[in-house]
């Protein structure tokens, strides 16, 4: 793998965007990969490595590698705006009719090009349960841990002036570089001290299998030049430097073609024209929203839904689009003292913005190389909270499995306040509820219909109320109070669980972590193929049987690495 990293360095110097789009699209290929996110780009790099396979990757969005706002960590919320599938779910009755936005990455890099760069694997037992659900023992923690080592490496930040627990044995020598932040916003220590005092948690590294505790955060940021480390400028650059790889951007796949039950290729739109690509094998890596959408448009899904829309049924697979889970989070937003560095300061204060720009331009120092503050904690909800309701989903989980994550960021999630804001939130990270993704019509241009069903069971509701109350308990601790000017939201005394619930309903967001809509064990066989079909596989977050207990980008890289091994073994 050290050799691969050296190859990446050579590719970085030799390749800009010359391989980003091909004026003459190929007519056939060994593997077509639909989607240029982390799964698709890892697969492209792995499947092309021997030089024997012709690999074509089709990405609906643009290249992202020269988009400065995405490459600069602190400005990711701004840069992401133009590089997303701007999906909005249906009004959710559990949220009083509010309709969550569910942005997905659009462009090479997918979600890794627009996310907050959190690199976290979470509880080991999640993956052992995935192995049981899927029948693929390669997904068990002991096996998948090797894939985590193979896809990432840790680099020490040269100017970090603070202590942080990092278990360096949990990192390998793969292409993706991860690091800790090079500076602090001023809110990290108060928040950490409050969490330790109020919740009794201690610091861990959630990349070594620990699921519960406090983590000061590892991020997918290059340690030295403080730019985003993501699938496009790691796996993508290496793959795209090879003559047997074709990556075509702005290529929107509209349909998978079949001969009977055998996938034979895809149709896609490029420059206003429909193009047909024949392929020996089709791999769909569009993510948990776009993958089920494409399968449904191609005739793979519930027969009743497809027939209603006039789509010929290739395979009646009722579970396609079902089992949608996410990490919904409910916000408490604070106005903080001027010494805390926030996104508002750097976008509203021209003096602070100029200083930050000068620091970053000079030697990559200063807040522009950070990702807006980054400390989070995870914990379980006591069994007693579920007294009188069916809480088996939560109470039966392995002891290392957390139910709730709390976190903060210097990004104001709630608009309307002209002040320096810190957003804090409580998130259900092992929810019971499931939603679904369906088609609006048989037109590929129409957005899918997304029903989130957040907090959809009595146990979910009890768990998020408990988590939200614990978050506010942390924020009431003296170390945080001295940094707080006012509580912007909810901003009132919440004297009952009903009042807490109303506050949660009023400001719940999607974490952008949808999973499960083409799940292993339900839609897929253990070898990533779709049950009942041939020559088609799915590899992305849609295949998760249920969510990981932390931010999922780290898991997608490892999962794709494991899938590539399985594919190369099976296709010999």
From Swiss-Prot:
GO molecular function: flavin adenine dinucleotide binding; oxidoreductase activity, acting on CH-OH group of donors
InterPro entries attached to this UniProt entry: FAD/NAD-bd_sf (IPR036188), GMC_OxRdtase (IPR012132), GMC_OxRdtase_N (IPR000172), GMC_OxRtase_C (IPR007867)
EC code(s) of this entry: 1.1.-.-
Highest taxon of source: Eukaryota
Top-level EC class: oxidoreductase
Effect of deleting the gene: Significantly decreases the production of dibenzodioxocinones by approximately 67% and significantly decreases the growth rate.
Induction: The expression of the dibenzodioxocinones biosynthesis cluster is positively regulated by the transcription factor dibT.
Keywords of this entry: FAD, Flavoprotein, Oxidoreductase, Signal
SUPFAM superfamilies assigned to the protein according to its UniProt record, in alphabetical order: FAD-linked reductases, C-terminal domain, FAD/NAD(P)-binding domain
Transmembrane segments: none
Record function comment: Dehydrogenase; part of the gene cluster that mediates the biosynthesis of dibenzodioxocinones such as pestalotiollide B, a novel class of inhibitors against cholesterol ester transfer protein (CEPT). The biosynthesis initiates from condensation of acetate and malonate units catalyzed by the non-reducing PKS pks8/GME11356. Pks8/GME11356 lacks a thioesterase (TE) domain, which is important to the cyclizing of the third ring of atrochrysone carboxylic acid, and the esterase GME11355 might play the role of TE and catalyzes the cyclization reaction of the C ring.
Record's protein name: Dehydrogenase GME11362
Organism field: Pestalotiopsis microspora
